[in-house]
Structure formats: C-alpha cells, structure tokens
Amino acid sequence: MNIPAYVITIKDDPLSNECADKLIMSRAGNFEHEITKFDAIIPERVISLMTLHNLKWNYPMSEPVLDMQTGMWKHPYKTAVTEKRIACFLSHYLLWQQCAKTRDGMFIFEHDAIFINKVEVGLLNQSKCDIIGLNDPRGATRRAMQYHTAVQNSKHAIVGVPKIDTDQIPQGLPGNSAYFIKPAGAVKLLRLVNEYGAWPNDAIMCKQLMPGKLGVLRQYATKVQGVASTTTL
C-alpha cells in the first residue's frame, strides 16, 4: 500500500528545494513511501485561487479579534506580506482537497521538516485520530517545552493534542510542517473552512474545532530543520 506523501516546496526557491531534498534523503530507513514535491502556492496566485475556490480570508493581520462564531481569539501571525500567509494556507488546502478523495489518507510535509525516527504507518491507521502530527514541538511551536512535557508524560503512542493555553486560543499540532491526515480529517477541515472562512492552516486545524480528532506521535518522527521561515519574511 503506497500512501501519497507530499512536501510543499517553493518551485524557484533554492533554499526551499535544498531543504525539501534533505527531507526526502532523510526518509531512508524511516519512511517507506515516496515523497513528491508539491509546488507551493505563491502570493501572485492568491487572488485567483481564492476566487476560484470561493474562499474568503477571515483572520486578522494586525490586531487580535474575538471570533463570535467560535468564541476563540484570533491573534495575528507575524507576517510581512499578507499574501504569503494566505498562500501557505492554500497549499495545505489544495492538498486537503486531494486527500478527501483518497482511501488511505496522505502525508503532508513542509520543506523544513526532516526525519529523525521511523514512521509506523500501521499505528497511524489504527488511531482514532483523523490527523496526527509527526513533529517534535521543540523549535516548532509556541510554549514548546510545555507541549513536549505533556506529550512525553503520556503512556500512549499517539497522544491527544495537549492543552497549553486557555480554551479561547486555537491549539493544534506542534507546527504543521509534518502530519498524517485521513480522508475524514480532510473532509472535516474543508467543512470548517466553508463555515468559518479561511484561517492559517495551523489555526483552523485546532482541537477546539476538531475535538478528539487531533493527535501527536509520542516518539516524534520529524523535527524542523531550523531554517528561516518563508511565510513571515
């Protein structure tokens, strides 16, 4: 059984391709499925794609906003160019659309991920979670040590996303640069975007909107390479 796996890569960016190649090389002995480069959406395509898919960006860029539908605070991300943040969302969104049509799910990576341990696909398939993060939170998310400690204190191989903040703050995977997503998870995300509008992918994919459906590997399979973000610059 070959499960689709994609690494989101900026086509004409040397650093992005170099990092993606490192990820692909690191799969030896850790990941049995072929990883294909997926051309990242670039800012110049944002308007046309948002229009094509009838999407509306519904996330603040400068000041925090209380979302009345969900009761959660939406805090702006550090982003110099708004279209880069939306383009990042669109790259994941288009892969969610593909995943929703698959039978066995999909692995989605950003170019800054790299393998550090073997991925046990059977374990992922057997989990009740629809989306499972592969990443070590350290260096990949806010309150990383709190997140890491909560995961490591569990006895389970796949741990539910821990609570590291108030319920009014979206909380999800430890960085969205490496995760396994089942068709049911993709369908749910597409519905959430339709209902609440387009948010950053790691905000809409939160435990508050997907209760009981998000998990994290206790033995992390990937970590971030520690390169500069292409979204915040």
Please give the residue ranges for each predicted region.
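An acidic/histidine-cluster motif and surrounding catalytic segment
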Residues: 1-109, 113-233
